[in-house]
Amino acid sequence: MAAEPPALRLRPPGSTGDSPPVPRLLGGCVPLSHQVAGHMYGKDKVGILQHPDGTVLKQLQPPPRGPRELEFYTMVYAADCADAVLLELRKHLPKYYGVWSPPTAPNDVYLKLEDVTHKFNKPCIMDVKIGRKSYDPFASSEKIQQQVSKYPLMEEIGFLVLGMRVYHLHSDSYETQNQHYGRGLTKETLKEGVSKFFHNGFCLRKDAIAASIQKVEKILQWFENQKQLNFYASSLLFVYEGSSQPATTKANDRTLAGRFLSKGPLTDADGLECNNNFHLFGAPPNGMSVGKSLSKAYSRHRKLYAKKHQSQTSLKVETLEQDNGWRSMSQEHLNGNVLAQLEKVFYHLPAGRPEIPEAEVRMIDFAHVFPSNTVDEGYVYGLKHLIAVLRSILDS
């Protein structure tokens, strides 16, 4: 079993100091604020909880599902595990910290897991069920019929979006979609439906798509090289950073935005380089609208970025889609509080970083994992189709 979890932030990812108080439950735990799928707190199930130390608590399901998932985590994270396949699998799972029970209810058992979102400021989260079948080999005919009726296209598509939570820059808020959104996607609307997860209200986050593809491809590689386990009704949890700047840089950005709009213009010679090499030149010349001035500054920033990184062959973070998002923003969204809008522009810009952004893709939900001696063709099929859809979005 893994060591004790590190001390994590007290507030849920994406929350603010003005967030309403969260009800405290067993042992000081609170409902997981950023859960996008599964049993939710406040309904017929207790849902996923967050422990005061920052870990996630998943209540053990009734037999045989709960004991089966516990056995899976215990096997993979056994201290004496020497199986290369399982050791490699750990890289794609949330860290497991054993089981936990509240002092007042010792018979209630919870899996204690890493909160994959803890390092993100504004985490965008999507839960995608993988595989051509969402029922296991021992399911009854009634169970099979029930699962097939929920999403008849599962066999053909190979995955199902169970929920998503996307941070929108322009409103500083989250948009959420539940399982009904995913079940409503057809072969014709699947690409657009998945791309919604990567759109921040200004542009399509192709950098996050590319980073996610890399993670999924590593999981696919693991599945293609193992014949020990088959997974049913299991999911991938996607997470990427919705805010392009850490919270600690916002004060600096506000100062920069203020100087841009101040009466004392910055000359070309006074070009600023702040935070992650974002270049800003000059205040709006007399007679030039703020929108046009911003477009000009952005154009110069892009030219400098292209010149600086033209020899690099890494993935291009800035795209035509982002250009269009900029033009739309500069023409339509600069009414009212110009300073506030300008700050959002700074967060939106890629800031000249050539590296791949922070993103996570982890496997979750293991109540239907079974020993096998063959490649898990259903899961592999789903992964390959998901990668194909993501690549299609990236290349569009």
UniProtKB/Swiss-Prot annotation:
Pathway named in the protein's UniProt entry: Phospholipid metabolism; phosphatidylinositol metabolism
EC nos: 2.7.1.140, 2.7.1.151, 2.7.1.153
Keywords attached to this entry: Acetylation, ATP-binding, Kinase, Lipid metabolism, Magnesium, Metal-binding, Nucleotide-binding, Nucleus, Phospholipid metabolism, Phosphoprotein, Transferase
Positions that bind substrate: R65, K129, K143, I144, Q145, Q146, Q147, V148, S149, K150, Q179
Example of a GO MF term: inositol-1,4,5-trisphosphate 6-kinase activity
Subcellular location: Nucleus
DNA-binding as UniProt keyword: no
Binding site for ATP: K58, E114, D115, V116, D127, D365
A Pfam short name: IPK
Biased segments, Low complexity type: 1-13
Enzyme class: transferase
Gene3D superfamilies in the cross-refs: Inositol polyphosphate kinase (3.30.470.160)
Keyword Nucleotide-binding in record: yes
Catalytic activity: 1D-myo-inositol 1,4,5-trisphosphate + 2 ATP = 1D-myo-inositol 1,3,4,5,6-pentakisphosphate + 2 ADP + 2 H(+); 1D-myo-inositol 1,3,4,6-tetrakisphosphate + ATP = 1D-myo-inositol 1,3,4,5,6-pentakisphosphate + ADP + H(+); 1-octadecanoyl-2-(5Z,8Z,11Z,14Z)-eicosatetraenoyl-sn-glycero-3-phospho-1D-myo-inositol 4,5-bisphosphate + ATP = 1-octadecanoyl-2-(5Z,8Z,11Z,14Z-eicosatetraenoyl)-sn-glycero-3-phospho-(1D-myo-inositol 3,4,5-triphosphate) + ADP + H(+); a 1,2-diacyl-sn-glycero-3-phospho-(1D-myo-inositol-4,5-bisphosphate) + ATP = a 1,2-diacyl-sn-glycero-3-phospho-(1D-myo-inositol-3,4,5-trisphosphate) + ADP + H(+)
GO cellular component: nucleus
Cofactors that this protein relies on: Mg(2+)
Co-factor binding details: Binds two Mg(2+), but the interaction with the protein is mostly indirect.
N-acetylalanine: residues bearing it: A2
Region (Disordered), start-end ranges: 1-22
GO BP term, example: phosphatidylinositol metabolic process
Modified residues (Phosphoserine): S19
Locus of motif Nuclear localization signal: 300-310
Domain of life: Eukaryota
Family statement: Belongs to the inositol phosphokinase (IPK) family.
Function: Inositol phosphate kinase with a broad substrate specificity. Phosphorylates inositol 1,4,5-trisphosphate (Ins(1,4,5)P3) first to inositol 1,3,4,5-tetrakisphosphate and then to inositol 1,3,4,5,6-pentakisphosphate (Ins(1,3,4,5,6)P5). Phosphorylates inositol 1,3,4,6-tetrakisphosphate (Ins(1,3,4,6)P4). Phosphorylates inositol 1,4,5,6-tetrakisphosphate (Ins(1,4,5,6)P4). Phosphorylates glycero-3-phospho-1D-myo-inositol 4,5-bisphosphate to glycero-3-phospho-1D-myo-inositol 3,4,5-trisphosphate.
Protein name (record): Inositol polyphosphate multikinase
Organism of origin: Mus musculus (Mouse)
